[in-house]
Every structure is written in C-alpha cells, then in structure tokens.
C-alpha cells in the first residue's frame, strides 16, 4: 500500500492527443477483433477460462470488457458533463449548491474546488415538492423509500443518466419495494477537461444532493437509503462519515445564522448500501500490490486502470491516498447508519471489502452485513456479467 498516488499513472503520452488518439483507435479495431476470435475459441474449454466456474459467456464477456478498458486507458479517455436535460427529459433536475457553511472541514471550498451547480436523474419520476403537496410536508401516504445513489466510473466516467445507469436504477427500485424512487446525482468527474473539478468535488456534490432531498424536497432522512457502487460507494460512505461528524460538532453556539444551524444538523440516512466498494485507495493506487492480488486474472479492472483512478481523485499535491475519506477501510467509525457491503469473490477488491466489513462490524453499536458473491468480478450488478 502507498500513501501518495503516482502522477505518472494518469495517461499522458502521444495516444492521448490527436492525431495519436485516432490512429490508436484505428489500430485497436483489428486488435480487438483478433482478441475476440482468440478468446472465443480458447474459452470453449472450461479449464482455460480465467475462472473454471464461469460459463463461456461470462468468461468471454469479462475478457472483452477488460480489453475495452485497456484501450480506454491507453487513449486516456475521460468524460465531459453537461447540465442540459437532453434525452433525460423531465426526469432531470438541476440543483444549486447549499450555503457555504454546509461544506466544512476537508470538503470546504478552496482556491481550486468550490461547490457548484449539479444535475441529477430521478427514477421513475421527480417526486412532488413541499409546495406541490397540499400539506407542505413529507407526507407520502406509503412513506416509501428514496434512494440517493452514486454511480461508479472511477470518478472519470458515467453520469447517472438512463443510458449508463437506468437499468441498475430500475433494478434497485424494484428490489426495495413499491413506490421506491431513486435520485442519481451527476456528480462532477475529476477527469472532466471542461470543469477541471478535482477532489473533493464529488463529495461536495453528495452534500448538495442530500440537502436537496432533505431541505428542498422535505424528505425524511428515515426514508433515505444511500447507495453506491465502486467509486460511488466511496462517496456514499464519505457522506455517512461527514454527516455523523457534522452532527457531533454542530451546536447553536457555533452556527453563523439560524439557517446555517439547520443545515449543520442534517439527520443521518436510514442505511448505506455499498456494492464492490472502493474503500482503500492506498491499495488501488499501488500497481504492484494489485498485480500480486489473487484475483488479478479474474477481474476486468487491471492494475494500471485502478492506479489511474486513484491518481485522478487524489493528486499527491492535494490529498493522500490513505485519507479517511478515500481509504475508509483503514478508519472504521461508529455510526447508527446500517451498512450493507457486497463484493464479488473474483474481484481484486474482494479481500479489501471483507476486511473493511470486519473492522466496521467490530465497532460497538455498528450494524454491518457483508455479502460475498462467489466467482463474480467487480461491480457485477452494473456490468451484468452474471448468468
């Protein structure tokens, strides 16, 4: 494990710029075709698959995803965001940042990163605001669950919109019962070349989204379920830690104004669901440790890709990889929020996730459930690699 990310892990060679990027993409076409043919023949024989328990389709799909990620890393592709609704239509909302006092400690504004306007997608639709409800309070008849979900993507990709998160959002809503709604913030990506938003922008956006649910929409925190997969789980658990610390430190005496005190006393959510969570960036940023991992060959996320994600969210000049908010596996804390932690038995993060669950369970008062799905790689729910 390492304390600081390697800046050289961020792709920056000739392939990341034009015309090199276009040339490399053209070269990649026959490369992918040849690899696909090779693996499609090789994996006919189950002993030759990365995991002998996998079906032919699982083995081939996992390897092709891994190949695609290698090419994405080689060209240094990152995603830029827009606040326009586009095809998302009336499921889309934009949110103004909260009062400056809501962002404190490590998530306070600095000269490089400040809270900003974000967008987000509701599934299946936007709930009524207090003004739209006749009694002006959180009075849904069924008191159904509201999920605040943070997508994966190594802080480099994805948006939470239907094209990349719709299937998972619908699956989550269905699993949590009738009437469930989920809100997927389009948090700022650290690889977005338009905004250049670095750490702690995604965490600031999580605070903005939570305040939007509780204060603007009047949704009781007892109805809110936090959820996150992979890097999204990093954000979800960071929000749990931050809100718990906020409530401990907040008091009327240190509030600047009455509205400030209300923000500082945001109640904690009901539960936090984490799927294949990235809870140890000091491990993910260490390429040599990942290459030695027992699941290195069965996961589609390779060592250079993980190191890139770690370096992107944690530039060494700004934050350490072993920061409590980036490597919470090393810093268990007491929380009344129930924690559910899932990992795949064939993913690189499997042992890290199991260790984190054990440490958090050992804290008196914590309620932690750990589920390990045998023979599955990273973030299996999002990538649909299961049979």
What are these regions (language model features)?
Residues 1-142, 281, 308-311, 340, ...:
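Extended, polar/charged low-complexity intrinsically disordered and coiled-coil segments in eukaryotic
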Residues 17, 21-24, 204, 218-225, ...:
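Alpha/beta hydrolase fold serine-hydrolase catalytic domain that processes acyl esters and thioesters
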Residues 119-176:
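Short, surface-exposed "cap/lid" segments of acyl-processing enzymes
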Residues 149, 177, 193, 212-219, ...:
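Fold-level signal for large, globular catalytic cores of enzyme and receptor domains
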Residues 154, 187-191, 279, 377:
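Alpha/beta-hydrolase active-site loop signature
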Residues 172-192:
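Conserved alpha/beta-hydrolase
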Residues 196-217, 238:
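Alpha/beta-hydrolase active-site loop
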Residues 228, 232, 236:
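Gly/Ala-rich beta-loop-alpha elbow adjacent to hydrolase catalytic centers
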